[in-house]
């Protein structure tokens, strides 16, 4: 049984006239009559009662007609959904992200994505950078938003965002009287950092700046995410360097200052498997690139 057999039957059942149905289908009557006869033989029951004067549906034919209509409707819906999925307008996109990506980078992209593709379900999972790479390779997430470096050649990487770092220090700290902080100011200060495994490049860059200045930083505490780091600064435990976007984490007990002689940049990248051809990824990358362009234009304007 082919799809056209159902279409032929529906036409005859609705017209109750083989001649009219044939014209509707742009075919001649004899082959149409033959196709309906073959359909009845395959189904194993009489679907249409024929006389010289009229055609009418049998009880079995009425039941079969209803199911034929539903079948064609479902097939049509299936075709539409398949096409929408292939175009990246339907489906599931699983995104892994580090917490710092939520300060200003990720939320507007998700908002724009949902606006353009409302039928796509987005699943967001907060995962560390190292584990994101594992989840990408296993196929458990489609996209990772994480910190460099990445070691796996199976992953495609695109720059997502770069943000200069500022110094976060307790509001009552004596250094808050200065507009900017030098590397020498940090020599004897207690330092809080994001753990090396959470953000290896930024961690090592800071260590290197201090060693070039002739001292090893006094790191008193490490944490895996900047929300906790800011909380520790607020408690007066020490000071830390954070992406300028982290200033959005409003805290009355923390003050931010520019850093002189220390050019630390926080970087995020977007990663996905090279063999992952999910069309939803392409749309995400495009929206991300547009967002970066708008951000750069806005920064240039200010």
Swiss-Prot record:
> What's the superkingdom here?
Bacteria
* Molecular-function annotations in GO: DNA binding; DNA-binding transcription factor activity
In the record, the note on similarity to other proteins reads: Belongs to the LysR transcriptional regulatory family.
GO BP annotations, alphabetical order:
acetoin biosynthetic process; regulation of DNA-templated transcription
Q: State the GO CC annotations.
A: protein-DNA complex
Matching entries from PROSITE patterns are given as: HTH_LYSR
DNA-binding region, residue intervals: 18-37
Q: Which InterPro entries match?
A: AlsR, AlsR_PBP2, LysR_subst-bd, Tscrpt_reg_HTH_LysR, WH-like_DNA-bd_sf, WH_DNA-bd_sf
Domain HTH lysR-type stretches: 1-58
Q: Does the keyword Zinc apply?
A: no
The protein depicted here goes by the name HTH-type transcriptional regulator AlsR
């Amino acid at each position: 049984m082919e799809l056209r057999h159902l279409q032929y039957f529906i036409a005859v059942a609705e017209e109750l006239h083989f001649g009219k149905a044939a014209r509707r289908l742009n075919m001649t009557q004899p082959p149409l009559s033959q196709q309906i006869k073959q359909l009845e033989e395959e189904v194993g029951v009489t679907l249409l009662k024929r006389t010289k004067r009229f055609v009418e549906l049998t009880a079995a034919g009425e039941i079969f007609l209803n199911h034929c209509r539903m079948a064609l409707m479902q097939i049509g819906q299936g075709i539409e959904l398949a096409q929408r999925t292939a175009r990246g307008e339907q489906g599931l996109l699983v995104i892994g992200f580090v917490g710092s990506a939520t300060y200003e980078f990720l939320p507007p992209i998700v908002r724009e994505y949902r606006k353009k593709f409302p039928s796509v379900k987005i699943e967001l999972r907060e995962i560390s950078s190292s584990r994101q790479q594992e989840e990408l390779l296993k196929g458990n997430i489609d996209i990772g938003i994480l910190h460099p470096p990445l070691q796996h050649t199976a992953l495609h990487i695109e720059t997502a965002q770069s943000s200069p770092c500022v110094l976060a220090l307790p509001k009552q700290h004596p250094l808050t009287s200065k507009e900017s902080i030098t590397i020498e100011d940090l020599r004897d200060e207690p330092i809080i950092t994001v753990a090396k495994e959470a953000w290896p490049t930024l961690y090592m860059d800071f260590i290197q700046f201090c060693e070039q200045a002739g001292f090893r930083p006094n790191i008193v505490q490490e944490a895996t995410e900047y929300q906790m780091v800011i909380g520790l600064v607020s408690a007066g435990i020490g000071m830390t360097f954070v992406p300028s976007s982290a200033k959005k984490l409003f805290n009355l007990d923390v003050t931010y200052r520019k850093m002189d002689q220390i050019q630390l940049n926080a970087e995020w990248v977007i990663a996905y498997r090279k063999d992952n051809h999910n069309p939803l990824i392409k749309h995400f990358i495009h929206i991300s690139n547009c967002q970066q362009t708008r951000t750069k234009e806005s920064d240039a304007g200010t």
